[in-house]
From Swiss-Prot:
Positions of disulphide bridges: none
One of the protein's GO biological processes: DNA-templated transcription
Provenance organism: Arthroderma benhamiae (strain ATCC MYA-4681 / CBS 112371) (Trichophyton mentagrophytes)
Keywords: DNA-binding, Metal-binding, Nucleus, Transcription, Transcription regulation, Zinc
Single GO MF descriptor: DNA-binding transcription factor activity, RNA polymerase II-specific
Subcellular location, principal: nucleus
Family matches, as InterPro entries: Sec_Metabolite_Reg, Transcription_factor_dom_fun, Zn2-C6_fun-type_DNA-bd_sf, Zn2Cys6_DnaBD
Superkingdom in the source lineage: Eukaryota
Keyword Transcription regulation tagged: yes
Name under which the protein is recorded: C6 finger domain transcription factor nscR
Location(s) in or outside the cell: Nucleus
Ranges of the DNA-binding region feature: 17-43
Function of the molecule: Transcription factor that specifically regulates the neosartoricin B biosynthesis gene cluster.
An annotated GO cellular component: nucleus
Amino acid sequence: MEKRGPKRRQEAAHLSCELCRERKVKCDKLDPCTNCSSAGVICVPVRRPRLPRGAHAQRLRRISPEDPEAPIQIDIAPPADAGTIADDDLKERIRRLEALVDSMRSSNHISKQLIKNFQTNKDQEAQDTIESTLNGIDEDSLLIKGPRVHPSDGGLRILGLSGSSSPETGWASIIEDREISMQLCQVYLLNVDPVIKILHRPSLEKWMLQGQRYLGLPEGHAAVESLGAAICYVAATSLTETQSWARFHTTKSSIVARARRACETTLEKSSPLLSPDVTTLQAFVLYLVARRSEDPSRAVWTLMAFAVRIAKALDLPRVTDDNFFDQQMRKRLWLAICLLDFQTSLSQPSEPLITVVEATSSFSPPRHINDSDFDPTTSHDIPDREGLTDTTFSLVSYHVQAAGRLLNFEPCVKDDGSRQQHVQHFEQRTLRLLLYCDPESTPYAWFTWHRIQCFVSGARLSAIRPLLHQHRDHPIPILDANEGTSILSLALNILEKVQLVHTDPRGERFRWFVTVPWQPLAIAISECYICQDRSLVQRAWPIVEAAFQQHEAAVSGSSKAISITLERLMCRVRGKLLPSLGTSTSITTSPTFGTTDAANALSVPHTPPSRSSIISNGDLLSNWSWTTAELSRPGEELALVTEAPVSTSPQKVDPLLLSLDSPLLIAGQEQLVEADQSWAAWEERIAIGEEERRQEKKEKH
């Protein structure tokens, strides 16, 4: 048998992207292409060696050119020594060829007639032809055309993590390129690490920025590779278009698509469904965080079940006897999963996978310290710090998900007194962390300051308007005009804080993490419908309109039930309010709140020069219903709270929150039986929308 000469490997060509190929339209082969850019979707380019042409393509010809249905034969003479090949060698070659045919069949890179010819001709002549064909085909060029399903992929390809069946040959460059990976790591440390605290910052810097090994794991370890790709992916999703062009000279969608493909490919290799490594689960959680920011569909909500099961299989909820470093990493990871589970349940909406009992019984927050205070060799316990630390915002988020589960998904918490008590405990735990926090010091301090105030408003709103109302097993209280105004003010404060992050330059790094919540938006729309305070409605309606536009832009293509219901309710409220309010409340700004005009139109402080612009004289923590001294007095309900001394000069809080410190909101409200008008209108609108959708489905069938 003649020995084949070495063949030059073909360079990968830039072919039509996946979407243009599926839609069968001409692709201009740009990155991203014009068709995908105009459609507003992510362009996934395809790069692979071109198929044989000219004289090479004539090797596959038809027996009868006049017969279009004739099978294809291979015009290669059988080798002279074919009869001397051992049976086992022939079987091995046939097995290899069948594997190639199976892989090519999945990607449609070879004609169906040729596959049929390979499968049906089983005589000796066909076997000799197959053997000759195998020797004449560049096996490497065929392997890159279709992906192989590894038996250790843990089923992730079945879950759709791979996106499509045509892998991009340049996916690894985003990880192997030292400069790109270092820049994305820097973006992660700036934009993601302050709000999603599951990694150890110094260890990450030594690994991705200084080139050292990560926590003693060998280089090329599957878990380490998947974590690096997940860091690049979530960092790419946190970029703005301006930052993407400034750092990488390309669009955000292009860098996100490449990073996502790299992350999904490395996750398949690391098999998070089967891996016992906590590092692999960290990578999977970061993938879910990035996917949720990029894709508003229910994909992350579905995949959360796997993250919760894996965490329980690794026994993350249980306090172990590991060293201090491992304990902190396990606590951070488990509470981050609890937070993501709570967030995805609110966005759908549905009940969380982790029950209230599981979340509260395993609630053991990590230390309120900086990452520089400990390392993997730390064996002793480290006490909590005072003031703002690397973990302040994360600790507040952990308390938010714990209180949110009790207020929204716990049927046992029915009486208003206990609900308001939960709110008060939440305020004590979170606002304690706000002591000594100067919002003018850093963008992170500014963001933490305003988000904590937003969380407090959200907790108070959930105490009065929990999601449990939609289950009809909790009586809806009726409120008078003043109390209804307080509800509208709470909802407006949440929407204003969201808009502030999207307009103030100090919130640019964290805008990817902040979206318009549909619950306060729905409550604000409903309250505007029945509110009798004309001046309040006149101030509120532009904020509601702008928040609605941003919400619709963010959930485009998903959450249809909520989106359609909100849109119909908005049309109903517009018809009532706009004729009476006139054109003074019209909104013509961008729904992304990216301009100064939007900030001025919404009366949101854009860049306050000092703290005096966001607070007023006398607005102190001591003005709350609980005194500052109570913050430093430990008790059973504060066993998990950081100990801090009484501040001699406590920081000031948003005056809107202080104006709502009434006995009704803090001490509890009286039990009333009739339904409130605004919530009744909201539930009526939901019922009407569901009935209309059912009628539409019947008409289609």
